[in-house]
Amino acid sequence: MGLFTPKKPPLIGVDISSTAVKLLQLSQAGGRYRVEHYAVEPLPPNAVVEKNIVEIDAVGEAIRRALARSGSKLRHASAAVAGSAVITRIVPMSADLSDDDLEGQIQVEANQYIPYPIDEVSLDFEVLGPVRDNPEMSNVLLAASRTENVDMRVAALDLGGLSARVVDVEAFAMENAFAMLADQLNVGRDALVAVVDIGATMTTLSVLRNQRTIYSREQVFGGKQLTDEIMRRYGLSYEEAGRAKRKGGLPESYETEALEPFKESLIQQISRLLQFFFAGSEYSKVDQVVLAGGCASIEGLGAMLEEQLGVPCVVANPLARMSLSPRVQAQALAQDAPALMIAVGLALRSFD
């Protein structure tokens, strides 16, 4: 199973996160995309831990429920493995190799770049373009993941009634979805855009330049910290705390006791991720921050981050320019939109 090889027929994008399964199906007409079907189905606690599937039956059942609720009739899907489960390298290769020869050469040379036995990994590659100052060579992006990581995604989809046609890398799916945001941002050519995806247990920083990912890093921190604090402080179950976090109903003291400290901790984590990027690169600032993920819409977070970093900050909506099928609930979709970046990137693989 290739990690990011485009395949036909049409695909439904399936993002398996630590707390939910997100399904999205798009169509395209006249150069414009339309949301045909979507669903978000919660996962039981610890079914997926730090993006690794632990309880495959529970994940498969959640996919099955989400598929039924979405109303989609597609049975071919694209999913993704987390960046932490993938090794990527940019490797120079002769530009005159055919795809078959290039694939053979990569299989031969992969041992140099992959720290696992080659028969235990799934490999894929993408030609990025000529090497600067040496047009006889091409830069080739090599991606590899332990086969077990890929197989778990494939098996979960199968249990949910879907056939995996593409297993992508989350960072590449994020890059794919970023194309839907690019014209919403007031940044020039060569600007650095930091996309911060704040999930339940992981926060991922992707830095893009001219819509290409130049850096990606994950940090174990996310919305579950706030859910755990609500459980501890107010004596609620995991499900009750998650519901209260989304819909309200907590005591007035919640904002000062739990929410504000969480926002401050989250901003510290984001600042730390950016410092890692600056320390290992030629850059010392970014030009724009885009907040994505389930925590992106926390009231006041963007303004606090903008003040802390001195950089414009917006909340991602990769669906803003898309039309909606009548069967899609617009209000629910708008609320979920910042958390659908990876699902959008995966659904867009239908049109590669």
Specify the residue positions occupied by each region the protein language model found:
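Conserved phosphate-binding/catalytic loops in two-lobed NTP-binding clefts
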Residues: 303-343
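Active-site neighborhood for divalent-cation/phosphate handling
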Residues: 76, 80-182, 288, 318-324, ...
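Glycine-rich phosphate-binding loops at beta-strand->alpha-helix junctions
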Residues: 259-262, 284-314, 318-320
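Glycine-rich phosphate-binding loop plus the immediately following alpha-helix
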Residues: 48, 148-176, 212-252
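Adenine-nucleotide phosphate-binding core of ATP-dependent small-molecule kinases
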Residues: 228, 232, 241-288, 295, ...
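Non-catalytic, solvent-exposed interaction/assembly segments
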Residues: 1-109, 151, 163
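Phosphate/pyrophosphate-binding loops at sites that engage ATP/ADP/AMP, CoA/4′-phosphopantetheine
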Residues: 63-75, 160, 236, 271-288
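Gly/Thr-rich phosphate-binding beta-strand-loop-beta motif of the actin/hexokinase/Hsp70
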Residues: 2-42, 75-80, 184-215, 222-225, ...
